[in-house]
């Protein structure tokens, strides 16, 4: 085997975006490490994890970037939209405001990401059924009107977390077609480590 061949057939760069506290980091932890913590600390700037999956007999390396949802980091994260193959917009099903802000996040995607980037809408914390305020049908109809897939997830119970990332990978692979080369993602020398900062308030479910 030639040493030029990478260990994967595709490399997809994915972004997790959405308001602070909706559970983006918990979704990433569940998918990449299969762990969950009630008292997760706020992501500062950008952090990423890598997981390799198998899909239709192909090996796909997912580089998943977890971006801070705080307003003050909007300018930092704008550069991370570039080169992304897929973007997962996350809201909290117990927080109407986070769902209302999805439109704003979609505007960010239109402004900064490549035109044909794949999108996925995720309503997290679906295990909190008694606190749920965003109806599944409402969110599904909204996603359908935009032509993007929608799933409700629970990072706590691992509900649909795997499915969300696999759906995104399958959509990107379908769009790129059989002629796509391994890699695809832009090479970047920027390395930003997230620094733990204690966050007052509840966990991220």
UniProtKB/Swiss-Prot annotation:
Quote the catalytic activity from the record.
GTP + H2O = GDP + phosphate + H(+)
* Highest rank taxon of the organism: Eukaryota
Residues bearing the modification Phosphoserine: 194
Keywords for this protein? Acetylation, Autophagy, Cytoplasm, Endoplasmic reticulum, Endosome, ER-Golgi transport, Golgi apparatus, GTP-binding, Hydrolase, Isopeptide bond, Lipoprotein, Magnesium, Membrane, Metal-binding, Nucleotide-binding, Phosphoprotein, Prenylation, Protein transport, Transport, Ubl conjugation
Q: Which GO biological-process labels does this protein carry? A: autophagosome assembly; autophagy; cell migration; defense response to bacterium; endocytosis; endoplasmic reticulum to Golgi vesicle-mediated transport; Golgi organization; growth hormone secretion
Describe how it is modified after translation: Phosphorylated by CDK1 kinase during mitosis.
Please describe what this protein does: The small GTPases Rab are key regulators of intracellular membrane trafficking, from the formation of transport vesicles to their fusion with membranes. Rabs cycle between an inactive GDP-bound form and an active GTP-bound form that is able to recruit to membranes different sets of downstream effectors directly responsible for vesicle formation, movement, tethering and fusion. RAB1A regulates vesicular protein transport from the endoplasmic reticulum (ER) to the Golgi compartment and on to the cell surface, and plays a role in IL-8 and growth hormone secretion.
> What name does UniProt use for this protein?
Ras-related protein Rab-1A
The gene name reads: RAB1A
